[in-house]
Every structure is written in structure tokens, then in C-alpha cells.
């Protein structure tokens, strides 16, 4: 009897796809640091990294070597186990969230009927990582930074979910492939769910703690926030994890609001990966552009904005979407 039954082969292929996708995401997250520095230099009319290799292309390799050989030092006053666990949770939770994103019709790790719920479950783990890092560091700046980050993340994750409920109500499914295929036969959700898209994008920037929502890491106030005591590879995991979060939110924006791997008006359906990559790269550059162009508001302004603007907008969007869906399905409404 052969061990290579169809079920075993399917498991092997799933594991291979998962390894390829996760390695690609980690590599892209590391390279994104160099891309961001070059783009910021270009937009701000100054030199970016341009000393190591042609056009500074080997700067990321130099940074990685420096990080690998830095001493992995644990301060004597920290809780060692939780201090070490925090960066692992921060990076691994975001990586696991990638398994439900369909990149092309044939390439994706897991096709879950509860794909969006799985994403929210994994994204919610990042709050624990931040709290672990701040509390275990036994540092007042780290603790204040973690409290800021957790409050901000929990607040904006509410609107992250509510913004997607309009999409779920229209499609009738939490499966991301179903959402992409629905957009192939209808308008992309950027048009009927424009307010949901705006709220999701704002909440995505806040959840990833990117500028201008980077108050948990404000250098002037908190001396780099909850990872002030980290060095070496532990700090590197937080650093790369932030860029992985940018890629994750950008890929979700493409999947949920911009047709996924489909091109506009059905153009060039033979290259689905190219369309997905181009649209994701556009939103990544938009993240970087925000850092270059918008000043950092106060923390109280960030929290006021979430509850006084994002909450009413998402609720109105959800109610209007539900009313339109019910109006177009009178049989369901009558029952």
C-alpha cells in the first residue's frame, strides 16, 4: 500500500505552499525597509542609503549582518520568558494570518470558509505581544508604550471588523475566494463600499502602528516605546513584523476591495499574480507616503478620531449596506 495517497499529497502540497508563502513574506518584509528608506529619500529630495553596493542595494544585507551579530542581551530586571516570547508572538501571528489570503486562483495556503474570522483571530494576538513586551521589560516607558499600543489596537480593530461587515453582507460569505470571485462578476468593492474601504485603510494604518498612528513608539515622549529594552534578533523580529503587517493590510485591501488577482475590466487575466503584486505594491507605497507627508497627532486626538469619526462612519455604512441588500432580496425580508 502506497503512503502517497491523495490526502497525503494534498497535505504535502499545502505545507510546501505555506513554507514558500511565509518565506516570501519574511524576505519582502526585510527588503521593504530598504525600499522605504530609498523612497523617503527620493520624496524628501535627499540621499537615501547609497554607500553599500550599487545604489545602496546591499544596505539591507549589511543591516541584517549587523543585527545577526549584535549581542542578544537580556537586561537583568526583565521577565526572561515573557520578554523572549513577545517578539515571537508579534511576528508569528502576522505570518499565520497570511495563510488565508488567496494570491492567485491556484496559489493560496488555506481556503477557509471563515477566512476573515481567522484573520481577526490572528491579528488580535498582536495585542498580547505588545502587552507582554511592555510588562516584561520592567521599564516605565515600555509599559506606557504598550498600554498606548494595546488601547489603540483594540479600538481600531473594532472598526477594522465593522468596515468589512459591509463586504460580508453583500457577498454572504467570510471566504476570501468567494469575495474575490464576487468582484470578478460585479463592481470592485472600492465603489459600493467606499466608506468601508476608507475606514479599513485608516484602521489598518493604526493597527500596524505606522505613522501617523505611531504614538506607542513616539521617540520624543516614550523613547521608542514598548521595545526600548530589546536588541539584536528580538528587536529585529519586532522591526520585520511591522513591515509584515504593512504587507498583510495591503494584501487584504487588494483582496477585499480591489478585486484580488483580477485586473480592471478583465484585462490580462493570464497574469493574476502580476495584478495582485502591483496592487499590493501600490498600497505599500501609500503607507510609506503617509510617513513622508503627514505629521504625528497627539494620542488623545488619535483615540477621539477613532470613536467619534470611525465608529459612526462604519455603522452608517453597515446599516445602509444591509438596507440595500434587504431591499434587493424581498423574499428574505418577507420571511
UniProtKB/Swiss-Prot annotation:
<feature type="transmembrane region" description="Helical">
    <location>
        <begin position="154"/>
        <end position="174"/>
    </location>
</feature>
<keyword id="KW-0520">NAD</keyword>
<dbReference type="InterPro" id="IPR001694">
    <property type="entry name" value="NADH_UbQ_OxRdtase_su1/FPO"/>
</dbReference>
<comment type="subunit">
    <text>NDH-1 is composed of 13 different subunits. Subunits NuoA, H, J, K, L, M, N constitute the membrane sector of the complex.</text>
</comment>
<dbReference type="GO" id="GO:0009060">
    <property type="term" value="P:aerobic respiration"/>
</dbReference>
<feature type="transmembrane region" description="Helical">
    <location>
        <begin position="11"/>
        <end position="31"/>
    </location>
</feature>
<keyword id="KW-0830">Ubiquinone</keyword>
<dbReference type="GO" id="GO:0005886">
    <property type="term" value="C:plasma membrane"/>
</dbReference>
<dbReference type="GO" id="GO:0048038">
    <property type="term" value="F:quinone binding"/>
</dbReference>
<feature type="transmembrane region" description="Helical">
    <location>
        <begin position="114"/>
        <end position="134"/>
    </location>
</feature>
<keyword id="KW-0812">Transmembrane</keyword>
<dbReference type="Pfam" id="PF00146">
    <property type="entry name" value="NADHdh"/>
</dbReference>
<keyword id="KW-1133">Transmembrane helix</keyword>
<keyword id="KW-1278">Translocase</keyword>
<feature type="transmembrane region" description="Helical">
    <location>
        <begin position="307"/>
        <end position="327"/>
    </location>
</feature>
<feature type="transmembrane region" description="Helical">
    <location>
        <begin position="81"/>
        <end position="101"/>
    </location>
</feature>
<comment type="function">
    <text>NDH-1 shuttles electrons from NADH, via FMN and iron-sulfur (Fe-S) centers, to quinones in the respiratory chain. The immediate electron acceptor for the enzyme in this species is believed to be ubiquinone. Couples the redox reaction to proton translocation (for every two electrons transferred, four hydrogen ions are translocated across the cytoplasmic membrane), and thus conserves the redox energy in a proton gradient. This subunit may bind ubiquinone.</text>
</comment>
<keyword id="KW-0472">Membrane</keyword>
<comment type="similarity">
    <text>Belongs to the complex I subunit 1 family.</text>
</comment>
<feature type="transmembrane region" description="Helical">
    <location>
        <begin position="238"/>
        <end position="258"/>
    </location>
</feature>
<feature type="transmembrane region" description="Helical">
    <location>
        <begin position="187"/>
        <end position="207"/>
    </location>
</feature>
<dbReference type="InterPro" id="IPR018086">
    <property type="entry name" value="NADH_UbQ_OxRdtase_su1_CS"/>
</dbReference>
<dbReference type="GO" id="GO:0016655">
    <property type="term" value="F:oxidoreductase activity, acting on NAD(P)H, quinone or similar compound as acceptor"/>
</dbReference>
<keyword id="KW-0997">Cell inner membrane</keyword>
<dbReference type="GO" id="GO:0003954">
    <property type="term" value="F:NADH dehydrogenase activity"/>
</dbReference>
<keyword id="KW-1003">Cell membrane</keyword>
<protein>
    <recommendedName>
        <fullName>NADH-quinone oxidoreductase subunit H</fullName>
        <ecNumber>7.1.1.-</ecNumber>
    </recommendedName>
</protein>
<keyword id="KW-0874">Quinone</keyword>
<feature type="transmembrane region" description="Helical">
    <location>
        <begin position="270"/>
        <end position="290"/>
    </location>
</feature>
Amino acid at each position: 500500500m502506497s503512503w502517497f495517497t491523495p490526502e497525503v499529497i494534498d497535505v504535502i502540497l499545502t505545507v510546501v505552499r505555506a513554507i514558500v508563502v511565509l518565506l516570501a513574506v519574511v524576505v519582502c518584509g526585510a527588503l521593504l525597509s530598504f525600499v522605504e528608506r530609498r523612497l523617503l529619500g527620493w520624496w524628501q529630495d535627499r540621499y537615501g542609503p547609497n554607500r553599500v553596493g550599487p545604489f545602496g542595494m546591499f544596505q539591507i544585507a549589511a543591516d541584517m549582518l549587523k543585527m545577526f551579530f549584535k549581542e542578544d542581551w537580556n537586561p537583568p530586571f526583565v521577565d526572561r520568558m515573557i520578554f523572549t516570547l513577545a517578539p515571537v508572538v508579534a511576528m508569528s501571528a502576522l505570518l499565520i494570518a497570511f495563510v488565508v489570503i488567496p494570491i492567485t486562483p491556484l496559489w493560496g495556503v488555506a481556503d477557509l470558509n471563515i477566512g476573515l474570522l481567522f484573520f481577526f483571530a490572528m491579528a488580535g494576538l498582536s495585542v498580547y505581544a505588545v502587552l507582554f513586551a511592555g510588562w516584561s521589560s520592567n521599564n516605565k516607558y515600555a509599559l506606557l508604550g504598550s498600554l498606548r499600543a494595546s488601547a489603540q489596537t483594540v479600538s481600531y480593530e473594532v472598526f477594522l471588523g465593522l468596515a468589512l461587515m459591509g463586504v460580508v453582507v453583500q457577498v454572504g460569505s467570510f471566504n476570501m475566494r468567494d469575495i474575490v470571485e464576487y468582484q470578478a462578476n460585479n463592481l470592485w468593492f472600492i465603489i459600493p463600499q467606499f466608506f468601508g474601504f476608507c475606514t479599513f485603510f485608516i484602521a489598518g494604518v493604526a493597527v500596524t502602528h505606522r505613522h501617523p498612528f505611531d504614538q506607542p513608539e513616539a521617540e520624543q515622549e516614550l523613547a521608542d516605546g514598548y521595545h526600548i529594552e530589546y536588541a539584536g534578533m528580538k528587536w529585529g523580529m519586532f522591526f520585520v513584523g511591522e513591515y509584515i503587517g504593512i504587507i498583510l493590510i495591503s494584501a487584504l485591501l487588494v483582496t477585499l476591495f480591489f478585486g484580488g488577482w483580477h485586473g480592471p475590466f478583465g484585462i490580462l487575466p493570464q497574469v493574476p499574480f502580476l495584478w495582485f503584486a502591483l496592487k499590493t505594491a501600490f498600497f505599500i507605497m501609500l503607507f510609506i507616503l503617509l510617513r513622508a507627508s503627514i505629521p504625528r497627532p497627539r494620542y488623545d486626538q488619535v483615540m477621539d478620531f477613532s470613536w467619534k469619526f470611525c465608529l459612526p462612519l462604519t455603522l452608517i455604512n453597515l446599516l445602509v449596506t444591509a438596507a440595500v441588500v434587504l431591499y434587493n432580496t424581498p423574499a428574505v425580508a418577507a420571511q
